């Protein structure tokens, strides 16, 4: 009887140690490459220039959250190439990067 209990305990311990570790999630990067600056912008001029832009108030963890964070302050999520001055961004991409 003791051998059965010890064998069962040893088997359970071995199974528990063999289970895979939880996978780490990759950090979401809203904008990358040429369009590397994540911004919340209010005014779009011909899809080339956005006015009244600023950094998102919180770090987004998904494309939907990036859009909702900017929407919450009355602006739209944009990925920009070149900051010209603090209130204007040049050459934008309409949508943040998805998974």
Swiss-Prot record:
One of its GO terms (cellular component) is extracellular region. Disruption phenotype: Leads to increased growth rates, conidiation and enhanced tolerances of conidia to abiotic stresses. Reduces Arabisopsis thaliana root colonization ability. Disulfide bonds join 31-79, 40-70, 41-53. Gene3D superfamilies: Hydrophobin (3.20.120.10). Coiled coil: none annotated. Residues 1-18 form the signal peptide. Belongs to the cerato-ulmin hydrophobin family. This is Class II hydrophobin 3. The lineage of its organism: Eukaryota, Fungi, Dikarya, Ascomycota, Pezizomycotina.
